[in-house]
UniProtKB/Swiss-Prot annotation:
It comes from Gluconobacter oxydans (strain 621H) (Gluconobacter suboxydans). Pfam families: TENA_THI-4. This is Pyrroloquinoline-quinone synthase. The lineage of its organism: Bacteria, Pseudomonadati, Pseudomonadota, Alphaproteobacteria, Acetobacterales. GO terms for biological process: pyrroloquinoline quinone biosynthetic process; sulfur compound metabolic process. InterPro entries: Haem_Oase-like_multi-hlx, PqqC, PqqC-like, Thiaminase-2/PQQC. Pathway: Cofactor biosynthesis; pyrroloquinoline quinone biosynthesis. The keyword Oxidoreductase applies. Its EC number is 1.3.3.11. The gene is pqqC. Belongs to the PqqC family. Transmembrane segments: none annotated. It catalyses: 6-(2-amino-2-carboxyethyl)-7,8-dioxo-1,2,3,4,7,8-hexahydroquinoline-2,4-dicarboxylate + 3 O2 = pyrroloquinoline quinone + 2 H2O2 + 2 H2O + H(+).
Length: 239
């Protein structure tokens, strides 16, 4: 590929999101449009918990490699957003409020015993990607947050409208993300616009975002196959 201007690079990143972000997945359309039953929503929340719980570990692997205090301070905030600054705070704790509200046993959720194999493989692949790839690629892989405010708004409004078993309280995880995600993506986008200075680096950045979109899409493929089409693998959560 030829060298892109920063604006051209950003345009291609946004095009990847328009084509590949998981708000386009059929399972998410069903979730937002009220087409799932409570058991299927439970399965989604249970499996998504593993992703939420591993985000701080993913960010910690990158934090350890960042070369400046400025970058580390910025990335440390992401860990605090998810882990909280004291027990019972942060995004992971709020996600457990969602699984509690859906009637799932908290010990069972945290045990990870009911995960779909594809959930575990996909999330672990993402954590390993951030650990093993370049800092530039690792930061670029977080750019799905460019698109998350739209899906969060669709999800919250759709679920509140269609499901009587959720409330604003059980969906409290999503409210802070409406401000946290744009803040984080603004930083990551500015970083890749500045640091991706060669065609090879720009290709790496685009590939990282495509990879992350594939991780999220694959998780929904597995949920759809198991809990919509009815092919639950041995050992996974059975409603």
């Amino acid at each position: 590929m030829t060298l892109l201007t920063p604006d051209q690079l950003e345009a291609q990143l946004r095009q990847i999101g328009a084509e590949r972000y998981h708000n386009r997945h059929p399972f998410h359309r069903k979730l937002h449009d009220g087409k799932l039953d409570k058991a299927q929503v439970q399965a989604w929340a249970l499996n998504r918990y593993y992703y939420q719980a591993r985000i701080p570990a993913k960010d910690a692997t990158l934090l350890a490699r960042l070369p400046t205090a400025e970058l580390r301070r910025e990335w440390r905030r992401r860990i605090e957003d998810h882990d909280g600054t004291e027990p019972g705070t942060g995004g992971v704790a709020r996600w457990l409020m969602l699984t509690d509200g859906l009637g799932l046993d908290r010990d069972y959720v945290e045990s990870l015993d009911g995960l779909l194999p594809a959930t575990r493989f996909s999330v672990d692949a993402y954590v390993n990607f951030v650990r093993d790839q370049s800092i530039l690629a690792a930061i670029a892989s977080s750019l799905t947050e460019l698109f998350s405010p739209t899906i969060i708004s669709e999800r919250v409004s759709g679920m509140l409208r269609h499901y009587d078993f959720v409330s604003e309280k059980t969906l409290a995880y999503f409210t802070p993300r409406l401000t946290q995600a744009p803040r984080d993506s603004d930083f990551a986008l500015a970083y890749v616009r500045e640091k991706a200075r060669t065609p090879e680096q720009q290709k790496e950045v685009l590939g990282a975002l495509e990879f992350k979109c594939s991780v999220l899409w694959t998780m929904l493929d597995a949920l759809d196959y198991a809990y919509v089409e009815g092919h639950i693998p041995p050992g996974a959560f059975v409603p």
